[in-house]
Amino acid sequence: MKEQHNALQLMMLGLQHMLAMYAGAILVPLIVGAAIGLNAGQLTYLIAIDLFMCGAATLLQLWRNRYFGIGLPVVLGCTFTAVGPMISIGSTYGVPAIYGAIIAAGLIVVLAAGFFGKLVRFFPPVVTGSVVMIIGISLIPTAMNNLAGGEGSKEFGSLDNVLLGFGVTAFILLLFYFFKGFIRSIAILLGLIAGTAAAYFMGKVDFSEVLEASWLHVPSLFYFGPPTFELPAVVTMLLVAIVSLVESTGVYFALADITNRRLSEKDLEKGYRAEGLAILLGGLFNAFPYTAFSQNVGIVQLSKMKSVNVIAITGIILVAIGLVPKAAALTTVIPTPVLGGAMIVMFGMVISYGIKMLSSVDLDSQGNLLIIASSVSLGLGATTVPALFSSLSGAASVLAGSGIVIGSLTAIALHAFFQTKQPNSADIKT
């Protein structure tokens, strides 16, 4: 992870990572803010503080020290898992209870990070490879929805949107085919730029939000008032944090494999503690719980640029645009179909890397084949048929609402079962 790049290259690589996660980062505050009835000024704050905290959380995770920080090229963003619970808590107990629950959940994760770190033994290659595949597969519907124009769009599925999205995909693939070196490493960024330029001539780019946005926005402690603590809300948000840790674990193992690093219990403990700190800070500044973003795994694999310096630039950019709303608004001009076209390549690379991780597994073992088949099938099923567990409520609803969690728990449970019942049935080549 010691590649050398000049300042301009680092900036472009960091910008590429930021643009890849930006849509997901601002979508959560938009949904939550609208659902809990925030006014325009409050919503502006929520988006700005979220971007600021995404950057701060990323930098915390990069800072590998004695107590926290996994030191992998990982980008953190607000977790989609929190959307439903935050809206529910806000409507039941009020907005301050949302942030009391986030603060409590973050503090518990920080204190229990040592316990969570011991779970590393439950993640052999057959489990981690399956989990990474599930993460990638579960993101494909998001990519296709965006390519079509985004859910709720009046032009959803229009020929213009589809051609624009697939055109971006084709452009990125052509860059990979005809170029090597640095051009190939920023193919996603160039695809986004080219797609936005094409969309401009199609009348799909609107700069009005850039003109209307303010120049400076300062983070504020307890912006929505002093937090309140309700036990049901705290328990719910703790479950959200645990789901986020499970999702992050797959990302950590994928990045460790890409960067040829073996993760220890201590590494995971520090990674989880950094994530807990990010969640805690999110609560204090009235933002969100945070988790590792899997789309950035695809970019690391595509670009072959594994330096944490690149991700540090991403973190700094996010902090900066969180302080300067006008800069943040500039990134929103990228049309949704353009993002969708790039996502197809990024998320596809996450899937392919999961397959690569499974190449170290003994696929002659029926136990391993059953672990992969069952975990991927259940994870994909829960993702594509979200109504499957609609009758559940409370904690069960939070856990079952994530295909990644369903698939991960299935892989872990089956691996433990086969190891216990038939010690040689799920052997893994090391």
From Swiss-Prot:
Keywords: Cell membrane, Membrane, Transmembrane, Transmembrane helix, Transport. Signal peptide: none annotated. InterPro entries: NCS2 (IPR006043), UacT-like (IPR017588), Xan_ur_permease (IPR006042). It is a multi-pass membrane protein. Induction: Expression is very low in excess nitrogen (glutamate plus ammonia) and is induced by TnrA during limiting-nitrogen conditions (glutamate). Expression is further induced when allantoin or uric acid are added during limiting-nitrogen conditions. GO terms for cellular component: plasma membrane. The chain crosses the membrane at residues 18-38, 43-63, 67-87, 97-117, 122-142, 163-183, 185-205, 209-229, 233-253, 274-294, 310-330, 333-353, 369-389, 398-418. One of its GO terms (molecular function) is xanthine transmembrane transporter activity. It is found in: Cell membrane. GO terms for biological process: xanthine transport. Pfam families: Xan_ur_permease. Uptake of uric acid. Belongs to the nucleobase:cation symporter-2 (NCS2) (TC 2.A.40) family. This is Uric acid permease PucK. It comes from Bacillus subtilis (strain 168).
